[in-house]
Amino acid sequence: MINIEKANTLIEALPYIEKHQGKTIVVKYGGSAMKKDGLKESVMEDLVLMSYVGINIVLVHGGGAEINKMLAKVDIESKFVNGLRYTDEETMEIVKMVLAGKVNKDLVNKIHTKGGKAVGLCGIDNNMILCDPYKNYELGFVGEIKKVNVELIESCLKSGYISVIATIGVGDDGETYNINGDTAASAIAKELNADKLILLTDVPGLLREPDEEKSLITEVILEDVDKLFEEGIITGGMIPKIEGCVDALNNGVNRVHILDGRVPHSIITELFTDSGIGTLIRKENE
């Protein structure tokens, strides 16, 4: 009976695998899925499986918990302004060391141990993420993206490698800047003309009632997003995520998925099964 169920699962996945073969998918990775070893393993397994079946994968990662841990070790306080990390010169050095060094290379190694091929990159490489200092309020070395150069990413994808990208940008003056991960993932997805953008979060998806997980909105049409803002359904940390989703959809990305990163194998459950999981945002009714 168990073997039949496994076979049925594989058969169910076949049309979805065929549909996604050769497509490019950008995954924003952060939150609990990065902190817990079991969840980290399941995400890496999902990415390697997707790569094996011919999907081009770009993994854009954060690392806030690791940055906080390192700052605490050197007695630097973690400060945030409107949800964005205040990044002075000393903090920026820690951010570079942790994101582009430890976290990025750990993820590349995890993918390798699962049998995949990966290359670790950051936004400084080949001037991949060009940015200006954030203008709205004083955040130190926090950048706003003005241009993304995906030549290096495309080269890695063509060679069959998963691109693992740390969200550090560079300015015209050569200064390095901390970049919001959701914003970076959206900008990279746009420039690659990706088929999908997937955001792993610490909630089931977009919720109608913030404290009620059963109020999950499973599907949103792009033209209805403004109404959700007006109704106060999109609030707090979900605001920059949804803004990034809208920007991606308006600039060539076909679909955006907001998934619960606390659920093991949430990515392949969403992409390769009939039931799916999380919130799908798309351009129009089908």
From Swiss-Prot:
Grouped into one coarse class, the protein's main location is: cytoplasm
For the keyword Nucleotide-binding, the answer is yes
What does the UniProt keyword field contain? Amino-acid biosynthesis, Arginine biosynthesis, ATP-binding, Cytoplasm, Kinase, Nucleotide-binding, Transferase
Look up the coiled coil feature and give its residue ranges: none
Location in the cell reads: Cytoplasm
The chemistry this enzyme catalyses reads:
N-acetyl-L-glutamate + ATP = N-acetyl-L-glutamyl 5-phosphate + ADP
| GO MF entries | acetylglutamate kinase activity; ATP binding
Gene Ontology cellular-component terms for this entry are:
cytoplasm
Q: Where is this site: Transition state stabilizer?
A: 28, 241
Q: Is Nucleotide-binding tagged as a keyword?
A: yes
What GO biological process terms are annotated to this protein in UniProt?
Answer: arginine biosynthetic process via ornithine; L-arginine biosynthetic process
Q: Which annotated residues bind substrate?
A: 63-64, 85, 178
Q: In which pathway does it act?
A: Amino-acid biosynthesis; L-arginine biosynthesis; N(2)-acetyl-L-ornithine from L-glutamate: step 2/4
Q: What is its EC number?
A: 2.7.2.8
**Pfam families the record matches:** AA_kinase
Family designation: Belongs to the acetylglutamate kinase family. ArgB subfamily.
Role this protein plays: Catalyzes the ATP-dependent phosphorylation of N-acetyl-L-glutamate.
> What name has this protein been given in UniProt?
Acetylglutamate kinase
| Species of provenance | Clostridioides difficile (strain 630) (Peptoclostridium difficile)
